[in-house]
Amino acid sequence: MNIPMAAGGQELLVFRPRELRDAEQILLSVRANRAVVLHTAEAGDGEAQRLIDFACGGMEAIGGQVHRIDAETFLFAPPQVCVQLDDDLGRQVA
């Protein structure tokens, strides 16, 4: 996946994997200092859980961050990326 970006900018990749073998790209991307949004809606329930478990375990191993956006969407970020959630900004989450 080749995504153009502004000079000095960060990349944010969106993955919609269908099976577990696609999850390795998530870890490789975070190790390359890219944040990744994982959207599991296109995977079956069992496969989605395996994807999430694999990615979360990988994040633990490399010191990355995991943030749950909703039931099917997660943000995985390198340790040096500052992630501010609505709660951190003092806003009401609906």
Each predicted region: which residue ranges?
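Positively charged, small/polar-rich N-terminal and surface patches that mediate targeting and assembly
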Residues: 1-44, 49-94
